[in-house]
From Swiss-Prot:
'KMSKS' region, short sequence motif: residues: 229-233
Residue window of motif 'HIGH' region: 39-48
One of the record's GO molecular function terms: RNA binding
Binding positions for ATP per the UniProt entry: K232
Intracellular or extracellular location(s): Cytoplasm
Key word Protein biosynthesis present: yes
GO cellular component labels: cytosol
Enzyme Commission number, as recorded: 6.1.1.1
Gene (UniProt): tyrS
Protein name: Tyrosine--tRNA ligase
Binding positions for L-tyrosine per the UniProt entry: Y34, Y169, Q173
Length: 418
């Protein structure tokens, strides 16, 4: 099975320009290819991972990746299938975000070894050197307004309005392809399926300006089996930056993937062989309640993104919280595992009497209910049941001098911080 066949078998090929020519290029020698990442935030997220891992698969097959950080295009904003104009970021912010994204990409691509080691480029380097007049003369003249208006990504914005700034974005992305082809012999661009219009602007410019053929391959935008856009948890993006989405939160995200998606996601997001995945699928289908596919998926992706130690910690937090073993976890681990539960910062004037604190922290609705909860054995401090109405919280109840975990009943948690 050649690399293109494997990508297809994994569900990673959505659309290509001349497929026969692309397969020929990929099987006859080393291809230099690129994927672009606009710094629209200070971190990449799971939505970017499909293209990143596809890029890694091609590198493992011997091809040479260029990771393009859009320091210039990030200042403009891509209109593709966006309902409204993006708010423009400052140059300083975009450059800062570009640096952070560079660091994240080095986790996935090999920038050190071999004649196909990855190269990092920033389109700000060439766009900052070209004047507006030169850009219009040397690039703009190859694009007709009719051609630009025909793109689906533009059509959808015509009625609501699109600025010239965003309208011109596709020309900038097209010029990226031309520049990388001219300087580095890059002949293939990879990106999300929503980028097709911008990406083919590059092949058009290559054909008209340099009489060369460029290839484009898009990866699918991933949705779950209900059609919901993939990569968000509780409406929030799942970030690759551990400070924005902890390894534990990412682990839980994959662990909670629906049964109908789990095997498909193993093909897309892991480097397990297709034979291994077929074996997992057989075991998984025999006992879906054991969630084998989700557990392996969570292990593989968290290890890939954050490393083996982070995976082990996420697994330990999961197991200890499930067993109610609060005392086996550090304050840092508890912060990860209980990041979504109510948090109350204890004030110096607060009463440390347990009944009072249950009401103050919003764990029990009233003192009467709080007393009943304590007497009925429904209150736990750091996993230990407390039934003393006169119990006073003390330093002994603080984990690493930072927090106390109170549980009411089986599932209602609150974290007290100091």
């Amino acid at each position: 099975m050649n690399i293109f066949e494997e990508l297809k078998a994994r569900g990673l090929v959505f659309q290509t320009t001349d497929e026969q020519a692309l397969v020929k290029a990929l099987t006859e020698g080393q291809v230099s290819y690129y994927t672009g990442y606009d710094p629209t935030a200070d971190s990449l997220h799971l939505g970017h991972l499909v293209a990143i891992l596809t890029s890694r698969r091609l590198q493992l097959a011997g091809h040479k990746p260029y990771a393009l950080v859009g320091g210039a295009t990030g200042l403009i904003g891509d209109p593709s299938f966006k309902d409204a104009e993006r708010s423009l970021q400052t140059k300083e912010t975009v450059l800062e975000w570009s640096d952070k994204i560079k660091g994240q990409l080095s986790t996935f691509l090999d920038f050190e070894n071999g004649d196909n080691k990855a190269e990092l480029v920033n389109n700000y380097d060439w766009f900052s050197q070209i004047s507006f007049i030169d850009f219009l003369r040397d690039v703009g003249k190859y694009f007709t307004v009719n051609y630009m208006m025909s793109k689906d990504s533009v059509k959808k914005r015509i009625e609501t309005g699109i600025s010239y700034t965003e309208f011109a974005y596709q020309i900038m992305q097209g010029y990226d392809f031309y520049e990388l082809n001219d300087k580095h012999n890059v002949t293939l661009q990879i990106g999300g399926s929503d980028q097709w219009g911008n990406m083919t602007a590059g092949t058009e410019l290559l054909r008209k300006k340099a009489d060369k053929t460029g290839h484009v391959m898009t990866v699918p935008l991933i949705t779950d089996s209900t059609g919901k856009k993939f990569g968000k948890s509780e409406g929030n993006a799942v970030w690759l930056d551990a400070d924005k989405t902890s390894p534990y939160e990412m682990y839980q995200f994959w662990l909670n993937v629906m049964d109908d998606d789990a095997v498909r996601f193993l093909k897309i997001f892991t480097f397990l062989s297709l034979d291994e995945i077929a074996e997992i699928e057989t075991q998984f289908n025999a006992a879906r309640h054991e969630r084998l596919a989700q557990k392996i998926l969570a292990r593989e992706v968290v290890t890939l993104v954050h490393g083996e130690e982070a995976y082990k910690q996420a697994l330990n937090i999961t197991e200890q919280l499930f067993a109610g073993n609060i005392k086996n976890l550090s304050a840092n681990e508890l912060k990860q595992g209980l990041s979504n539960v109510p948090n109350y910062h204890v004030q110096s004037e607060d009463s440390l009497n347990l009944v009072d604190m249950l009401v103050t922290a919003g764990i029990s609705p009233s003192k009467r209910q709080a007393r009943e909860d304590v007497q009925n054995g429904a209150i736990y401090i750091n996993g230990d049941r407390v039934q003393d109405l006169d119990y006073q919280l003390s330093n002994d109840d603080k984990t690493d001098d930072q927090l106390t975990v109170i549980r009411r009943g089986k599932k209602k948690y609150a974290v007290l911080t100091y």
